[in-house]
C-alpha cells in the first residue's frame, strides 16, 4: 500500500448516517451499553439522545419495551421514531405472566381469550408494519395468535375467573417444581 493511499484512508470519515433499530424501555434510556457504543460509533451525542428519548416517553408507563428507530443524519443529528409496545409485551400483560414458556408446545405459560387477541390486534394494526401493507385485521389476529403460541400462551374462546384461578394455581406449582429441579441441577453441577 502506498503512502498516498494510506493518507487518503486516514482522512476518510466513517459513515455517520443510517438507521438504528432497537427496543428501548420507556423512560429508561441510559448512555451505557448496548446503546451508548452504537450511537457513539456514529458520532451522535448519547446524552442528548437519552434526554430526548426519555422526554418523549415520559407519558408512557416506565419500563414498557418500545420499538425505536433512530435515523442518523450526515451532520450527526438524529430523529427518533417510537413505535407501539411489542406484541409479546401485550400478550404477556394480558396473560398476567412475566416470561413465556421454556418448552413451547409442551407447556402452557398463560391463557388469553380471543377478545384479548382482538384488542391487541386493533392496537397493532395501526403499526407501520401492518398499516403500510394494508393488512386486514384477520391477518393481524392470526399473526398475534402465532406469537402467543411461540410464547407458550394458549388462546381460548372463553375464560371464567374460576378456570383462570385454577390454571394460575397449577402454573405456580409447576414453576416452583421447575425452580427446585434447577437448583438441584446447579448443586449437582457444583459438586462435579
Swiss-Prot record:
Subunit relationships: Component of the mitochondrial ribosome large subunit (39S) which comprises a 16S rRNA and about 50 distinct proteins.
Gene3D superfamilies the record matches: Ribosomal protein L11, C-terminal domain, Ribosomal protein L11/L12, N-terminal domain
InterPro entries assigned to the protein according to its UniProt record, in alphabetical order: Ribosomal_uL11, Ribosomal_uL11_bac-typ, Ribosomal_uL11_C, Ribosomal_uL11_C_sf, Ribosomal_uL11_N, Ribosomal_uL11_N_sf
Keywords: Mitochondrion, Ribonucleoprotein, Ribosomal protein, Transit peptide
Organism classification: Eukaryota, Metazoa, Chordata, Craniata, Vertebrata
Protein's name in the database: Large ribosomal subunit protein uL11m
Molecular function per GO: large ribosomal subunit rRNA binding; structural constituent of ribosome
Subcellular location: Mitochondrion
GO cellular component, one term: mitochondrial large ribosomal subunit
Amino acid at each position: 500500500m502506498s503512502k498516498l493511499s494510506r493518507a487518503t484512508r486516514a482522512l476518510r470519515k466513517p459513515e455517520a448516517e443510517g438507521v438504528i433499530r432497537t427496543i428501548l424501555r420507556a423512560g429508561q434510556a441510559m448512555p451505557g451499553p448496548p446503546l451508548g457504543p452504537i450511537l457513539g460509533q456514529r458520532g451522535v451525542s448519547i446524552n442528548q439522545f437519552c434526554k430526548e428519548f426519555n422526554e418523549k416517553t415520559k407519558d408512557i408507563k416506565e419500563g414498557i419495551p418500545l420499538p425505536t428507530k433512530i435515523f442518523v443524519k450526515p451532520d450527526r443529528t438524529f430523529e427518533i421514531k417510537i413505535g407501539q409496545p411489542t406484541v409479546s409485551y401485550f400478550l404477556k400483560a394480558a396473560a398476567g405472566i412475566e416470561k413465556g414458556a421454556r418448552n413451547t408446545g409442551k407447556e402452557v405459560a398463560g391463557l388469553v381469550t380471543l377478545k384479548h387477541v382482538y384488542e391487541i390486534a386493533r392496537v397493532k394494526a395501526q403499526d407501520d408494519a401492518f398499516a403500510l401493507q394494508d393488512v386486514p385485521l384477520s391477518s393481524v389476529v392470526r399473526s398475534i395468535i402465532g406469537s402467543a403460541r411461540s410464547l407458550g400462551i394458549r388462546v381460548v374462546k372463553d375464560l371464567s375467573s374460576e378456570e383462570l384461578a385454577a390454571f394460575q394455581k397449577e402454573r405456580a406449582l409447576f414453576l416452583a417444581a421447575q425452580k427446585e429441579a434447577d437448583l438441584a441441577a446447579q448443586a449437582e453441577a457444583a459438586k462435579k
